[in-house]
C-alpha cells in the first residue's frame, strides 16, 4: 500500500501539471479553488485523473467535502486502506 | 474442411476468411479493408484507379485471387474451383465490410438487418465509392466515343446518367425478416448453405454485430466477428435497466446468447477475435462509467458541450441522450447522424426513441450546399418535424445544447459565436488513433480546440504527444479476462485466433488446440 507521502507526491504532480502551477504551491493546506485557481471543470478532470492513477472511485457526494489538497490525499489514503 | 485466413490474421482488421468443404462449396467471412496495408500504399488523395480498381488491388496483393468479383470491375478468372455460397458480414465496421463493393453481386450477402441498415446509412450519406457500393449502376466498358476521347480500352467507366446502364442488384439474406426499401433481392437464409447455419447477434460497439455458426462436413465452425461481453456485475446491469430500459438491456446480453447456442455444437472450430489480448490495461471501463463521467462534466459547466462518438454506436447515443435529459440539454445531431438513427429505427423498432427521448433530439442545420441521398432526406424530415436548429439558436442558449460533432464536422462550428466556443467543452468518446494518419488528424484537431479555447476531455496533449484517456470510452472488444472465461466455458475443440497481434496469448492457454496457419485443413 502506498504511504501518505507517496500519495501526496503523485497528487502534487498531477495537480501541478493539470492546473499549470508550480509544485511548491501544491501544499497539503492549499485550497484547490481559492489558492490554486481550479474551476469546476478542472475539479472534474482532476478527479478522473486521481481515479485512473490510484484505481479508486471517488463518489460524487464525497467530492463536495474535498476542499484542500490534503483532503484529497486523506480521501485516497482511506480508499486505498 | 479448409479454413483460409486470407487477411486479418496477425493484424487488427481487414478480415477476409474463406471456409471450404470437401465438395469445394464454401463461404466467406467478412471482406474488410486492411487499413495498415492500405496505408502503406494509399492515402486520402492517392487511391487505386477506379477504372482498374481490381487490377490495382490484386497487383498490390490487397485482395485475394479468387473468383468472387463483380464482372463489371474484373473479367479475369483464377484457377479456383470453389463455389461461393455467401459472404457473411459480421458487422458494419470498415475493417470488416470496407471492400464489399467489389464482390460479385450474385454472391448473397448474409448479415443482420441492422448491419444492412448501418451500411446503407454509411453508403448513402457519403460520396459514391466502388469499394463500398451496395447498389446503383454497374460500371461499363469503354465505348467508341470514349476511345475517341482518348480513354484507354482496358478501363471501365462510370455509366453516368445513362438509362440503359445495368443495375447492380445485390442479393441479401437475413436471419430474420427485414423490410427492405431498396432494390436488393432477398434470399432465404435457409437456402444459402447445404447444412445447418445460424447467425446470432453479438454485442459490439456497432449495432447489428453478429456471429455465425455453420456445419461444414462433420464439424461445426463458428466465427465471432468482433464482440464484447455485456454487464458483468449486478451494478452494471442495474445501470442498463435504469438508464436504457429492459428491452435495450437485451442488446448487451447478445454475446452470451451467441456462445450459449454453441455449447452443444461438437466438434467445434471457433474462429475468434483477440483484439485486446496484447493491451496492458489497468482500467476496464463500462458504459456505466462513461455515463457517470459524462454526468460530472455536464454538471460542471454551463457552456456549450461538443461530444464526439460514432452514432452507429447506439448505446453511446443512448448514454449521452440520457445525460442530456438529466441536465436539461438537447442533443444536437448532424443530418448525417440523424439519417443513421432513422435507418436503425426503421429496421429494429426496439431502438426507436420514446416520445420523451425524441423531444430531446435536435438536428443541426449546417452550412452545406450539397447533401447526399439519405442525409438530405433526414434534413428535410427534421425540418418537417420542427427540430432543425440554426447556429443562432445554439448561440442564444449554449447551456441548453450538446452537439454531436467530431473531427470532420468541426468546420461547421465556425458558424457559432467565438464567445460560445470560448470555454466550451469537447468530450472525446470514441476509440483512440491507431494509424499514423489518425495521429496526424488528432494533432490537427487539437489546433481547433486550442484556437477556440475549447476544453478537451478524453484527449489531451502531453509534451507534444496526443494522449487518449479512457474515461469516456468503453472498448467494443472483449477483455482478455472475459475472453479466457468464455473460451474455458465453451471449450472448443479447435481455436483459430484472428484480428490479433498476439496469437501467442492463445497458445499459452490452450496450446495444441490453437491453429495458427494461414490455411488450416481439418
From Swiss-Prot, chain A:
Entries under PROSITE patterns matching the protein: CARRIER, PHOSPHOPANTETHEINE
Residues annotated as domain Carrier: 5-80
Cell membrane recorded as keyword: no
Keywords linked to the UniProt accession: Cytoplasm, Fatty acid biosynthesis, Fatty acid metabolism, Lipid biosynthesis, Lipid metabolism, Phosphopantetheine, Phosphoprotein
Organism superkingdom: Bacteria
PTM-bearing positions, type O-(pantetheine 4'-phosphoryl)serine: 40
Membrane-spanning parts: none
Gene3D superfamilies reported in the protein's UniProt record: ACP-like
Location in or out of the cell: Cytoplasm
UniProt-listed Pfam families: PP-binding
Recorded GO MF terms: acyl binding; acyl carrier activity
Protein family according to the UniProt entry: Belongs to the acyl carrier protein (ACP) family.
Identification of the protein by name: Acyl carrier protein
